[in-house]
Amino acid sequence: MLQALLIFVLQIIYVPVLTIRTILLVKNQTRSAAGVGLLEGAIYIISLGIVFQDLSNWMNIVAYIIGFSAGLLLGGYIENKLAIGYITYHVSLLDRCNELVDELRNAGFGVTLFEGEGINSVRYRLDIVAKRSREQELLEIVNRIAPKAFMSSYEIRSFKGGYLTKAMKKRTLMKKKDHAS
């Protein structure tokens, strides 16, 4: 019974670690992923070693399976809380909506405004880049000012140049100055 509990706990730790490692790899953070992979490998070997010692012990096998499933739920929750990376939103508008553009820029979001041809009239599209951790804030601003806007989003794997890169460099330099003081 104690072994089954240990296996369950190890799986609840292992699967979120696996989830985080996978996300780091997808986000091209290979060094961090390698470090997390060390922990993942150790937990994997230990838990499977216990299960394979006695394959007739159904409690250990069930603990492994249920722990894996519970670990998936926990891993998804942790991933949402960490919100690693960046996201881009395309926001389609019927009018130019300078109020929305100004509000988003004042809040620190990178915004580019495009004018395009819709089926019946001119349409406007905003491309907005944000840290995933600020996605909810972004959505609240858009929904408050332009509740009828059409929105779609995707995650960014990498980017180069533009407003965000300059803003991040400024913040990094300011942090270094603050730490030096």
From Swiss-Prot:
Keyword Disulfide bond part of the UniProt annotation: no
Main location: membrane
One Pfam family matching this protein: DUF5698
Keyword Cell membrane: yes
Source species, domain of life: Bacteria
Membrane topology: Multi-pass membrane protein
Membrane-crossing residue ranges in chain numbering: 6-26, 32-52, 58-78
GO cellular component: plasma membrane
Subcellular location: Cell membrane
Keywords, sorted A to Z: Cell membrane, Membrane, Transmembrane, Transmembrane helix
Similarity field: Belongs to the UPF0316 family.
Name this protein carries in UniProt: UPF0316 protein Bcer98_2136
Organism, as annotated: Bacillus cytotoxicus (strain DSM 22905 / CIP 110041 / 391-98 / NVH 391-98)
